[in-house]
Amino acid sequence: TVSQYACQRRTTMENHNQIFTDAFAILAENAEFNESEGPCLAFRRAASLLKSLPHAISSSKDLEGLPCLGDQTKAVIQDILEYGQCSKVQDVLCDDRYQTIKLFTSVFGVGLKTAEKWYRKGFHSLEEVQADNAIHFTKMQKAGFLYYDDISAAVCKAEADAIGQIVEETVRLIAPDAIVTLTGGFRRGKECGHDVDFLITTPEMGKEQLLPKVINLWEKKGLLLYYDLVESTFDKTRLPCRKFEAMDHFQKCFAIIKLKKELAAGRVQKDWKAIRVDFVACPVDNFAFALLGWTGSRQFERDLRRFARHERKMLLDNHALYDKTKKIFLPAKTEEDIFAHLGLDYIPPWQRNA
């Protein structure tokens, strides 16, 4: 039987049901744009389930006994099986609001609320938005427009590795024994992504808050195009957060950095490419939890927390694991330790592409 929890399924990059999961992704995104949380989650859960199946769905009989599929999602699958496409999806793709909100939110620093505001003003293109003198852009949005072409192009694995080398070299100058780990989709074996995520820690507690120094060195070198440094608000006595989307409390930095052209893929007019990079610096005692959280996928993480809460009466987040029955924090040095605490088979990063 197939588990309702993504953390009990093995999901590689090999998706046998892309025609269905692509449709669900569009419907989920549209639901998100309409702030319909329930349907959005239902479509994402269904997509996640289908991604984990070792075979392609070829008839409605294949759906028998599968969890996570409601009437709405089954109707979409049925449509695609019969007509090769789903009319609901086609309607969304042709919808003016969907197209415009998707375009606006593709700008770094533009969220749903802002995109909605621009759409209500009657704007339909990025040019129209930028031409309006009444709009005051945030520092983040200005960077988003300035480097739009670079940032909206995919980042490939070779570029992520090149950035990794730069990060590693810089961090080592500050703390020779620091550990730098590439997280996110690239750690799960993806070939491309939208940004590059790194987790940094040091063997000695308290030495890990080194991002301001990294920023400083890069500013001197002229590597930084934009950055936003968020200081740590971590408190080790606080219980893990119940809300999935809550940002974690470690020191972190959202940046856009220059990658020299010979290191970047594809032909470009200038001799560098702007790439989005996120760094998180965490204490070594929390490293395993942060690594698990930042590796993803989001659906995998969401289900891992849901499993912990409902099946084990435990609270899990990017900082810690807390046993509500015993009223204690459970320590972990590795991701394997966390899976063991939860009584789950260990699932390696490349099988977490839920």
Explain the meaning of each model-derived region.
Residues K261-A354:
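Catalytic cores of NTP-dependent nucleotidyl/adenyl transfer enzymes across multiple folds
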Residues M13-F24:
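Short amphipathic alpha-helical heptad-repeat segments
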Residues I256-K260:
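Active-site beta-strand termini and strand-to-loop segments that position acidic
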